[in-house]
């Protein structure tokens, strides 16, 4: 069956749902796709299509970041349904690093929970620029005052993590009630169901409040590999988000990081099961690569314009060490500390070889949470690194630092 072509008409925005497990993120994602499809007369994705990996079906929990697409009148969205369980924070980091904005889902019946805060902190750390809040399960709360208290609590929490609590849109509704109404009918216009209207109001706010991102289309092409699979008879496909630049079918690219750099040719491009001739910054794309076996390429590598980026094991970086209140370490650490460095879609263990004060460049014996330091790092595996690149430092399930590469050594 021939694939249809992807038509680029509206600006493309990457968005995601974040929040505590079972607060209704996946239900909301399904309600959004179905509501927008129903208003425009197309077909939306049902809940079961979004919770797509087999292990999620068994647990009813979203594990790997599911990608869905939908359109409002003004934009085309790629939607990442972010996992809500603590052990999947790693996925959230790679999923969230690709978000231009997020919808924070909070159950009106429970209010903010520990993971709500953890996801907000992560959103701050990985640089999600804007957040809109959906106060879900409104149908389960009889007392209007209770909902107002939850809303106040959410605004205070947003302020704590440096998001504008006062001006952030908070939309009340029930994803489940909207979804049930949408299941009963294929086409629905605005005004025909109050629960569906609340979902459409949410998306109006997302359209207005989350800015259209500036894409780096004029820089050399780079895509961090998120996933790899083989298509029988066609070859190996690498998927990921194009970070910068653009790529066309027939272009020669390099696969960089973790192993020897390899050169290959792009023989096919797809986005949401549609064919592309060219892919640009911001696209979530599948790329067919000539002569590459599934074993040759893995998550954490990058596909890039030849010569534009090289693999390295050692670099200097300016790093902020998070305080206990920000979710970081409670205790200091010393030279020789070996945490995980999260860069794009990969995490690699690295040893901190030296520590210097950010203020006067003097050697530091010990680093305390809250410090800003310059550190030299030696990674156990080479990955694609460049000056100005951001990364997170994590250990034992918590983010301990956030940094920027200041110098590439070797």
Swiss-Prot record:
Record-linked InterPro entries: EF-Tu_GTP-bd, EF-Tu_GTPase, EFTu-like_2, EFTU_2, G_TR_CS, P-loop_NTPase, Small_GTP-bd, T_Tr_GTP-bd_dom
Region described as G1: 19-26
EC numbers, comma separated: 3.6.5.3
Where do the segments described as G3 lie?
81-84
> Which parts of this chain are annotated as the region G2?
60-64
The entry's localization annotation reads:
Plastid, Chloroplast stroma
Indicate which residues the UniProt annotation says bind Mg(2+). 26
Positions the record marks as coiled coil are none
In residue numbers, the region (G5) covers 174-176
What's the main place this protein lives? plastid
Keyword annotations of the record: Chloroplast, Elongation factor, GTP-binding, Hydrolase, Magnesium, Metal-binding, Nucleotide-binding, Plastid, Protein biosynthesis
Per UniProt, GTP binds at 19-26, 81-85, 136-139
Question: Which reaction is catalysed here?
Answer: GTP + H2O = GDP + phosphate + H(+)
Where are the stretches annotated G4?
136-139
Q: Name one GO cellular component term.
A: mitochondrion
Give the matching SUPFAM superfamilies.
Answer: EF-Tu/eEF-1alpha/eIF2-gamma C-terminal domain (SSF50465), P-loop containing nucleoside triphosphate hydrolases (SSF52540), Translation proteins (SSF50447)
GO MF term set:
GTP binding; GTPase activity; translation elongation factor activity
Question: What are the GO BP annotations of this UniProt entry?
Answer: mitochondrial translational elongation
Q: Where is the tr-type G domain?
A: 10-214
Q: Does the keyword Ligase apply?
A: no
HAMAP family registered for this protein in UniProt = EF_Tu_B
Function noted in UniProt: GTP hydrolase that promotes the GTP-dependent binding of aminoacyl-tRNA to the A-site of ribosomes during protein biosynthesis.
Protein family (similarity comment): Belongs to the TRAFAC class translation factor GTPase superfamily. Classic translation factor GTPase family. EF-Tu/EF-1A subfamily.
In Swiss-Prot or TrEMBL terms, this protein is called Elongation factor Tu, chloroplastic
Q: Tell me the classification of the organism that encodes this protein.
A: Eukaryota, Sar, Rhizaria, Cercozoa, Chlorarachniophyceae
